[in-house]
Amino acid sequence: MAGLRYRHGMSAAAILFALLLAVPAPAGAGDGPAPGKAWTFSFYFENDLFSGTDRNYTNGVKLSWVSPDLSSYRESGGLPEWAVPWVRKLPFINTPGLQRNVALSLGQSMYTPEDTDRDTLIRNDRPYAGWTYGGIAFHSKNESRLDTIEIQAGIVGPHSYAEETQRLVHELRDIDVPAGWDHQLEDEPGLMLIYERKNRVLDKRRPGGLGVDAITHLGAALGNVSTYANAGFEVRTGWNLPADF
């Protein structure tokens, strides 16, 4: 068993390395934006431990690198030259005069049924599943609007290594490991196309002072991992609110 886990670990590292190679890396200062314009790194972590449950969408981790504001996607230095004409043909994100950003990401999402103590197949509940992916997103924005198109590619199934991730987290926290991962979805390559529009419908931000704004969002995703439409609304308040979304 120890040897099997070791081989799995090596495969996971190989897959992660392949995803990193597949997604263009942020360019150096000489190839992309002017010096002083750095890429921004973000780490997202979602887990239902905060609500005391362990079911359905139970864990999500995402690492993202976002370029500085650009006048064109080519300026990022992270796109191969052959890809630039294709990006220019994408809808919604090529409106003249708007700022651009390129975002690169690596992530993993994990799903389990409500009853995680059973080691037999549960036919009337969400199956065990993991989705590990790399993504590239293109943003087009001004002060009041943000359009995003994202492409994600990865794998669902045992080689997503969601089981190993959950086992590690549960062992570190000294809690029971879900028993039914032997019945997770089989390996299948995944591809997702995601679009989202955000609009700032209220803007009472004050530089150096207390402000408030309100943002609506509307989006959809199409792919063999999930297909959905979404809509939402958020209100932000705080000191010196940034001009982001």
Residue ranges: model-predicted function:
Residues 1, 68-73, 200-202, 238:
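Short regulatory "switch" loops immediately downstream of catalytic or recognition motifs
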Residues 1-8:
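N-terminal secretory signal peptides that target proteins for export/translocation
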Residues 11-23:
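Bacterial N-terminal signal peptides
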Residues 29-73, 101-116:
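Short glycine/proline- and aromatic-enriched beta-strand/turn motifs that initiate or cap beta-hairpins
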